[in-house]
């Protein structure tokens, strides 16, 4: 198989690997093939082989806001975490798709650049953060992104401006066109380094206080419906602390689903569907997932 030829060329490709090793929920079935490219050239070669041989292709970043079903994923899964270079040029920071949002935000801060403080505790990768326009504490990626470099499924390199990314709440054009984020450049403002770092430390302390970081979790599961907050609705509906299998709606922060031990992706999804059903019945509000759900049923 062509993929195995690339393996002989030195690209890190594995077979039948449990994706639960990589997801923040510690759940998920196997990847038929799993690759960890170290350069954009390796990404291009992998994409080309999948297109020429009609092999299904799935791109994953830090797997922090992701649920992979227990049946796993056919074809090739590419995890981009080996692409992690971060460069500072004046008031701009350029980070590879696999660089963590946290590392990028702190690199900016340590250079006295302001504009990514909100991202100090977001556990995802730059690629995933751009893909879903990640945000926290009143800030979103769209406010800092200047441009995004991508590789299309057809193997073409492109650069999108902020406007071309079509950002909105937890959305970007990448979700629609399937392009692969390779890097993003952030346009920031000079600031007081110590004040920036102090603010980031404060936000991280707030996060530790409010969020159930002691358990595996995919973070905030649901998008916020207009005019409502998910947590209070879940509490009033009597669902906080509800558990199915090893998956529990957190007693510390309603709307976060944690793995209390031995949870499967099916446990997670059953609990998500239960919460959606009860909230619809009680409030006539459709809760949509912020977390990305992929893979096959078991």
UniProtKB/Swiss-Prot annotation:
Catalysed reactions listed for this entry: UDP-N-acetyl-alpha-D-muramate + NADP(+) = UDP-N-acetyl-3-O-(1-carboxyvinyl)-alpha-D-glucosamine + NADPH + H(+)
GO molecular function terms listed in the Swiss-Prot or TrEMBL record: FAD binding; UDP-N-acetylmuramate dehydrogenase activity
EC class name: oxidoreductase
GO cellular component, one term: cytosol
GO biological process, one term: cell division
FAD-binding PCMH-type domain ranges (all copies): 26-191
Subcellular location: Cytoplasm
Domain of life: Bacteria
Pathway: Cell wall biogenesis; peptidoglycan biosynthesis
Keyword set, alphabetical order: Cell cycle, Cell division, Cell shape, Cell wall biogenesis/degradation, Cytoplasm, FAD, Flavoprotein, NADP, Oxidoreductase, Peptidoglycan synthesis
Function in brief: Cell wall formation.
Protein name: UDP-N-acetylenolpyruvoylglucosamine reductase
Name of the gene this protein is made from: murB
């Amino acid at each position: 198989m062509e993929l195995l030829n690339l393996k002989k060329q030195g690209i890190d490709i594995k077979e039948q690997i449990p994706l639960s090793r990589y997801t923040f929920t510690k759940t998920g079935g196997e990847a038929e093939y799993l690759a960890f490219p170290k350069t954009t050239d390796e990404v291009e070669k992998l994409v080309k082989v999948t297109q020429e041989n009609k092999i299904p292709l799935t791109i994953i970043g830090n797997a922090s806001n992701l649920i992979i079903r227990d049946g796993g994923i056919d074809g090739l899964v590419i995890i981009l975490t080996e692409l992690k270079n971060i460069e500072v040029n004046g008031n701009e920071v350029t980070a590879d798709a696999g660089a963590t949002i946290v590392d990028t935000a702190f690199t900016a801060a340590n250079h006295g650049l302001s504009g990514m403080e909100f991202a100090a505790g977001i556990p995802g990768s730059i690629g995933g953060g751009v893909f879903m326009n990640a945000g926290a504490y009143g800030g979103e990626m769209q406010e800092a992104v200047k441009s995004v470099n991508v590789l299309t499924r057809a193997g073409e390199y492109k650069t999108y401006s902020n406007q071309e990314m079509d950002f909105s709440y937890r959305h970007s054009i990448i979700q629609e066109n399937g392009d692969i984020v390779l890097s993003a450049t952030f346009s920031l403002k000079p600031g007081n380094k110590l004040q920036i770092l102090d603010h980031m430390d404060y936000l991280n302390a707030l996060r530790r206080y409010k969020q159930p970081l002691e358990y595996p979790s995919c973070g905030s599961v649901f998008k916020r419906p207009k005019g409502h907050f998910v947590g209070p609705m879940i509490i009033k509906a009597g669902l906080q602390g509800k558990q199915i299998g090893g998956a529990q709606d957190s007693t510390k922060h309603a709307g976060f689903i944690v793995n209390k031990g031995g949870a499967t992706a099916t446990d997670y999804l059953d609990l998500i569907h239960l919460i959606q059903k009860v909230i619809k019945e009680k409030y006539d509000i459709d809760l949509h997932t912020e977390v990305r759900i992929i893979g096959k049923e078991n």
